[in-house]
Structures are given as structure tokens and as C-alpha cells.
């Protein structure tokens, strides 16, 4: 009935588990639940320094979330790959896109190494970008990111157009 967006990263899997437990307790159909956890640990390492586990263990948790949600909570956005914090940490618009798409590609490659279907988990990836006050630069950034992400996903084996979409929000 209500989509919940949780800006939580290293402990995102715990909050997701609590959310699912509450949904079960209140009789909700997990196949209909919608929401998002940020769950972007690579950004945490690069831009914020707020992480719990080393990168390898963190990537395992993230790909486990991709796999579990695809089966149990298929409308859940399993990650919001964040350029916002990268930009706030001092990057340019170009660097924001470069680092964010690079992180996104790393998540996709980790999921593929786990033999997950890119056309399934790819539809649940989302992005979060910063919008500074140069309107034309920001519009160009978003358009370029959209095209680059589609190409990255296609090169990694996506065939479903929805899996190649760059779904994002900005602030």
C-alpha cells in the first residue's frame, strides 16, 4: 500500500529483515511489498567511511539481497547506487557519474559471478544523483548516465529493456 525508502547501507539487510518480519506479522503479501534500501556499500567506502564489513563480505551481503528479494520480495528495489554522496564529498558532475556507474557495474558483475539473472535483478537496481545549480550540466549528466548505463548493462548481457533502464531520483 505504501512504498518505503530507507537510506541505510551497511546494516540495510537488518532493516530489510525487520521490515519483512513486520509485513509477515501483519499478514501482508511479500510479493506486493514495494520499497528501497540504499544498500550501497562501495559508496560508503569511497565517500563516507561508514561501513561495518570489508568489501568482499559486503558484496556477498548485497548479492544475497539481490537473490533473496528476486524470489521473495520481487518488487523491492534492492539497491540505490548513490552518486549523491560522492558529489557531496567533493567530486565534479563527471566524477559523480564515473564513480557511481563504476560502482553499479561492480555490483552487477558480483551478481553475475553468483549466476544471478541480470534481466531479473537488473530491473530492481536504482540510482540516486545530486543536482547542483547548473541546470544544463545536470541535464546533460543525467542523459549521459542513462545512455552509459544502458550500454553497460547490454555489454554485461542484459536483454530486457527494463533491466537496462537507469531508474533514478535526484536532490
Description of each model-found segment:
Residues 142, 152:
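Catalytic core of soluble alpha/beta enzymes
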